[in-house]
Every structure is written in structure tokens, then in C-alpha cells.
Swiss-Prot record:
PROSITE patterns: BACTERIOCIN_IIA. It holds the Pfam family Bacteriocin_II. Coiled coil: none annotated. Belongs to the bacteriocin class IIA/YGNGV family. Keywords: Antibiotic, Antimicrobial, Bacteriocin, Disulfide bond. One of its GO terms (cellular component) is extracellular region. Signal peptide: none annotated. This is Bacteriocin mundticin. Disulfide bonds join 9-14. The keyword Disulfide bond applies. The lineage of its organism: Bacteria, Bacillati, Bacillota, Bacilli, Lactobacillales.
Amino acid sequence: KYYGNGVSCNKKGCSVDWGKAIGIIGNNSAANLATGGAAGWSK
């Protein structure tokens, strides 16, 4: 199963595509800072 944030899981466990994960985390952090927390991370 792919979770859309660079993390995919199968019967063996989960793995992270750090290139995608870091890009998404960076984008969310920037959006969070710019809006005071209104955008970026889903709560």
C-alpha cells in the first residue's frame, strides 16, 4: 500500500522514499509557516 507521502508498506513492513518524503515535508512546513498553521499539515 502506498500512502502518498513517500511511505509504502507491504507484508514485510514499511519503507520510505526519502526524496518524496523530504520534498512533501518541506512543502508542508513552508505552507505551515506562511499561514501560521492553517495550511500544510492536515490535522
